[in-house]
């Protein structure tokens, strides 16, 4: 369903936005994992 864009018509801005969204998503994942880890350690110290 249009998941793979035709390489003949690729808008550089779209590519940049895609990379940006990927990077943001990756950072959010990492942050939430760090948060989970921190919560775990806090629970263990109590």
Swiss-Prot record:
Belongs to the sauvagine/corticotropin-releasing factor/urotensin I family. Pfam families: CRF. The modification Isoleucine amide is found at residue 46. This is Diuretic hormone. GO terms for cellular component: extracellular region. PROSITE patterns: CRF. Regulation of fluid secretion. Stimulates primary urine secretion by Malpighian tubules and causes a dose-dependent stimulation of cAMP levels in the tubules. One of its GO terms (molecular function) is hormone activity.
